[in-house]
């Protein structure tokens, strides 16, 4: 019987490969996206200091209603507003090994519309 590849292991391998090439600094931190079956999480990270500067997720009270894509838009808006409030305007987008499509794209577009540049 032919074995089926594990999608998450392939994604993790892709994410490790990309993470070797990009890093967030204090001037231009990394906007990391994690997508689960039920939610989406976004963090603005300074990799040099190892500190999360801003974050938002579907666990926040403001993000309870709507489809998963609509929730991703709200998470993108929230993380952008929180980052801009801390004086961060430019980030490096880390899609976490996911395809730039659907919820990940919706989050990225909402973050761009609300003041983050990448």
Swiss-Prot record:
Record key words, sorted: Ribonucleoprotein, Ribosomal protein, RNA-binding, rRNA-binding
Highest rank taxon of the organism: Bacteria
Any one GO biological process: translation
Residue numbers spanned by region Disordered: 1-26
Compositionally biased tracts (Basic residues): 10-20
GO molecular function: 5S rRNA binding; structural constituent of ribosome
InterPro entries membership: Ribosomal_uL18_bac-type, Ribosomal_uL18_bac/euk
GO CC field: cytosolic large ribosomal subunit
Subunit structure: Part of the 50S ribosomal subunit; part of the 5S rRNA/L5/L18/L25 subcomplex. Contacts the 5S and 23S rRNAs.
Similarity comment text for this entry: Belongs to the universal ribosomal protein uL18 family.
PANTHER family: 39S RIBOSOMAL PROTEIN L18, MITOCHONDRIAL, LARGE RIBOSOMAL SUBUNIT PROTEIN UL18M
Role, per record: This is one of the proteins that bind and probably mediate the attachment of the 5S RNA into the large ribosomal subunit, where it forms part of the central protuberance.
Name of the protein in question: Large ribosomal subunit protein uL18
Organism, scientific name: Streptococcus equi subsp. equi (strain 4047)
């Amino acid at each position: 019987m032919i074995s089926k590849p594990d999608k998450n292991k392939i994604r993790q391998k892709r994410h490790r490969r990309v993470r070797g090439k990009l890093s967030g600094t204090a001037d231009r931190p990394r906007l990391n996206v994690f997508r689960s079956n039920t939610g989406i999480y976004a963090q603005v990270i300074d990799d040099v200091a190892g500190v999360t500067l801003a974050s938002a997720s579907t666990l926040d009270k403001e993000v309870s209603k709507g489809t998963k894509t609509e929730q991703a838009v709200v998470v993108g808006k929230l993380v952008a507003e929180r980052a801009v409030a801390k004086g961060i305007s430019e980030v490096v987008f880390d899609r976490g090994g996911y395809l730039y499509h659907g919820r990940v794209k919706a989050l990225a577009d909402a973050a761009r519309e609300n003041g983050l540049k990448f």
